Each structure stands twice: as C-alpha cells, then as structure tokens.
Amino acid sequence: MKRTLTVLTVAATMFASSASAFDPDDLQILRNTGDCRNCDLKGADLRNTSLNSADLEGANLRGADLEGANLRGADLGAANLEGADLAFTQMNGAILCNTTMPDGSVIYSGC
C-alpha cells in the first residue's frame, strides 16, 4: 500500500509539472524573433523582457511572469493571460482583442 501511494504521488507530481510548464522551443522562438503566435508560454519567466510590438496573438501566457515587461504595441489578441503577473508591465497601444486578462475577464480593446 505504501509503495502504491508513493508511485501515485510521483506520477501526480510529474503530471502537474508538465501541465504547468511552457514549451522551451516556443520560448526560444520568442527570444530569437520577438514573435510567437499561438505559442505555449504558460508559466514562463518573461520579467523585464522587451516585447515591443511582438506578435503574441493566441499565445498561452497563463501564469507567466511578465513583471516589468515592455508589451507596447504588442498583439495579444485572443491570448490567455489568466493568472499572469503584469505588475509594472508597459502595455500602451497593445491589442487586447478577445484577450483573457489575469483575473479571468475577457476584454476587447484594439479590435
């Protein structure tokens, strides 16, 4: 019984870790090009990153740390920012059309 519980605990931990992690290839694409449409960046550390005018349409940024990031003029249409940290993030002129915000609300700005 004790072994079964240990196996189940390890399996659940592995599943939870993989379910909340970003795709490293997508993060590399973003870092190399500044664009990443429909990318999986959930939980990514993007603090103080310059993403000025980046194309992040449809990106999954759920739980991402965007504190202090520059998202001026970025296209975040249909992106998911639920649970993301946007403290001190610059978003002037960003497209937020059908975008899920950190609190779960959906806004339609710049459509």
Give the location of each predicted region.
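Positively charged n-region of N-terminal signal peptides that target proteins for export
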Residues: M1-L5
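N-terminal signal peptide c-region/cleavage motif recognized by signal peptidases
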Residues: A16-S18
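Tandem repeat scaffolds
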Residues: S20-C111
